[in-house]
């Protein structure tokens, strides 16, 4: 795990050959949906393991079959809330939760519109009660403009959990700048920080639309005729 000196509390995993190989597979246009999902799960599991190294542990006495000794209790690991942004973050969350089996899970449906305004729509939020001792992990594969994450984080600003983290696959400097400007104390962990955004707000070189690549392009539901009130 590498601390990026451009920001406070921003880390990447560019020093991990395993994660870089997995990311390479995700970037390839030839990678199919199921392989893409499995790759996101692997990244989430590895990064979740690395996150445990940043958490507080307490020493505790234990009794083995042979004698008394000293063990550790991962206090913070028991107070984790993982907030998943639909839909691309599901595989990432699946990997993360393998390291935090006691974690509570929140779901947020949020989407970003197209350039130039990149309007954010949030139409579903179901998140457990947050407490001062909680570590909140927001999973979102792509930190592009940062606007979606900012909208999500604003929903929980007043809860004042112990720590707030963002875990993603790729980030653009523009997105990190935007998030850190609004939430300076939020920690960001990503597999790699890419070059920049293109005019359409996509990370380049990037990996495309993570949701579409993980689950397939969405079906275009036709607008239903307006239902009349039958009462």
UniProtKB/Swiss-Prot annotation:
Pathway recorded for this protein: Pyrimidine metabolism; UMP biosynthesis via salvage pathway; UMP from uracil: step 1/1
Gene from which the chain derives: upp
Name of the featured protein: Uracil phosphoribosyltransferase
Residues reported to bind GTP: 38-42
Regulation: Allosterically activated by GTP.
A biological-process GO annotation: UMP salvage
Family: Belongs to the UPRTase family.
Keyword Nucleotide-binding: yes
